[in-house]
Each structure stands twice: as structure tokens, then as C-alpha cells.
Design a protein with these regions (language model features):
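Hydrophobic transmembrane alpha-helix segments characteristic of membrane transport
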Residues: 58-94, 186-200
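Loop-to-transmembrane-helix entry motif
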Residues: 47-54, 90-94, 167, 171-174, ...
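Non-cytosolic segments of integral membrane proteins
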Residues: 93-186, 224-277
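Alpha-helical transmembrane segments
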Residues: 191-208, 240, 271-275
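Short amphipathic alpha-helical coupling elements at transmembrane boundaries
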Residues: 26, 82-89, 116, 120, ...
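Alpha-helical transmembrane segments and their helix-start/interface "positive-inside/aromatic belt" motifs
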Residues: 1-10, 80-100, 203-213
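Binding/recognition "hotspot" determinant
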Residues: 1-58
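Alpha-helical membrane-interface segments at transmembrane helix boundaries
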Residues: 44-52, 84-88, 92, 141-144, ...
Length: 278
């Protein structure tokens, strides 16, 4: 190993980080139909269609439960306005179950518009937010063999940490897609709860949860954009001193900044719930 290996190791770790940030932008701007060529989406559509029959059964059950609970006897149904109200309620709930797929896609498109607006107003994702400063490279190139041994340890640990954090970041974004698929596939069952006012809270909670998952993309994009702007405003300080102290300070500050971003991305669901009251 030599000094060039130390620089190359750090640059490779930062390149992996930049690559994962670019991949995040591609994922959050991608529709469920486009993800992985649409193969997963086709399965989700099939499951959604198969569960519609169960949704209709639950809809009738919930509607009957609400009807029997709210009408002591059927005298109330003799009034045209009461009968019309129950009829319209049932028709609206049935339409929600029948067209739950277009409903879910419409919600996703609206939230996707929020993501595009956020990115568009701020100029999109930055290209390379992490680049090794020239003074760090120069300091590493000037050290001798014995002095470079501590640098090997620092760069190995720092590079490993940066690489692991970059994969944690991308795994969090991938998990959002899987949550979108789960919500969409199972949609007919919880939406059938709108058949009765007593069970409608379940349907409302489901839709709120789905909106929250969709809006996670906006929080993720905004977090990455703020991180990119922060890193673009200047590299972490590289104070004068030994090469080991300079590299250690640089790596420590980079790791701290990355930890903040990873924490925001992983907590995007909690942030959305707190902001939107979901």
C-alpha cells in the first residue's frame, strides 16, 4: 500500500456515496410502474384485482352492520331521504373499492408533483457532493512510509463507514417502494371499511398512511438537496497540522454530515407524520 492507495481509497468511498445519492434521485422520481421494469407492479395489480372480491364482501358486511346499528327498526328507511343517504353511501364506498387502483395512482401522482416541484425549485440534485479537497491529497502525498501507517487505519475505517452509510441510505429509499407496493396491493380490503361510519376510521387511517409514504419522497429529496447545498458551500475544514490530523478531521466531519442525512432519510416517515398530523 502507498500514499496513492490512501487517496484512492477515500475517493472510491466518496464516489460510492455520490453514486448512491444519484440513485436516490432516480428512485424517488420513478413511478411504481417503472420500478424494476414493471414486473413487481404487474404482480401488485394482480393481487389488487384478486382482493377486490374480498373487498366487496367486506363492504356488504360493514354496510349491513352499520345499517342495523343505526336503524332500530326499518321504519326509518321508509323516509326517502334516509334511504337515499344510505344508498349513496353504499354506492360511493363501492366505487372506492372498484376504482381503488386509479385512486392510489392519483394520490401518488399528486405527491410526485410535490417531489418534482421541490427538486425543480432548487435546481435538482447536485452531482458530486463529496470530493476530496486538494490540500488533503497534497498532505497525504508528502508523508513518509512510517507516518502513512496511521493514515491507512484512518482511511480504512472512514471509507468503510462511508460505504456502509451509503448502502443504508439507499436501502431506506428502496423500502419506501416496497411499502408503496404493499399499500397498493392490499388497498381493496381497508378501503372497504368505508362501507360503514363505524369502520370508516380504518379506511381513513389507511389513506393517511399511504399519503405519508408517498410524501416521504419529498422529505428524502429535500434532505438530500439541503445536504448537497451544505456540502457545496465548502468542504469540511482541513486545518493545518500533520497529515493524520487533517485526514482525521476531514473524515470525522464528513461522517457527521452523512450521519445527519441518513438520520433524516430514515426518519422521513416520522417527519411526515409530525408535519401533516397523520
Amino acid at each position: 500500500m502507498d500514499d496513492n492507495w490512501i487517496v484512492e481509497n477515500l475517493e472510491n468511498a466518496l464516489a460510492t456515496w455520490n453514486e448512491k445519492l444519484a440513485e436516490i434521485w432516480q428512485l424517488v422520481s420513478m413511478t411504481p410502474q417503472e420500478f424494476k421494469g414493471g414486473g413487481i407492479w404487474n404482480i401488485v395489480v394482480q393481487i389488487n384485482g384478486a382482493l377486490q372480491a374480498i373487498g366487496y364482501g367486506l363492504l356488504v358486511l360493514f354496510f349491513a352492520m352499520g345499517l342495523f346499528k343505526n336503524t332500530v327498526n326499518f321504519q326509518e328507511l321508509r323516509r326517502p331521504e334516509a334511504a337515499l343517504r344510505y344508498f349513496l353511501h353504499f354506492v360511493a364506498a363501492k366505487a372506492a373499492v372498484t376504482y381503488c387502483m386509479p385512486l392510489m395512482l392519483a394520490v401518488f401522482d399528486i405527491c410526485g408533483g410535490v417531489v418534482s416541484t421541490v427538486a425543480g425549485q432548487m435546481g435538482g440534485m447536485a452531482g458530486d457532493v463529496g470530493a476530496l479537497p486538494g490540500e488533503i491529497s497534497a498532505a497525504i502525498g508528502n508523508v513518509g512510509f512510517l507516518a502513512s501507517i496511521p493514515l491507512w487505519l484512518v482511511t480504512i475505517l472512514g471509507s468503510l463507514f462511508i460505504t456502509v452509510r451509503s448502502f443504508i441510505l439507499i436501502m431506506t429509499v428502496y423500502s419506501r417502494f416496497f411499502k408503496l407496493y404493499l399499500y397498493t396491493a392490499l388497498a381493496p380490503v381497508p378501503i372497504a371499511a368505508f362501507g360503514s361510519s363505524e369502520t370508516a376510521a380504518t379506511g381513513k387511517a389507511f389513506l393517511k398512511g399511504y399519503v405519508g409514504v408517498c410524501l416521504e419522497g419529498a422529505v428524502i429529496v429535500l434532505s438530500c438537496l439541503i445536504f448537497s447545498a451544505y456540502m457545496g458551500s465548502g468542504s469540511p475544514a482541513a486545518p493545518s497540522g500533520s497529515a493524520v490530523s487533517m485526514v482525521w478531521t476531514y473524515v470525522a466531519e464528513m461522517i457527521f454530515n452523512m450521519l445527519v442525512l441518513v438520520g433524516l432519510v430514515k426518519g422521513s416517515d416520522r417527519i411526515v407524520r409530525e408535519m401533516m398530523g397523520l
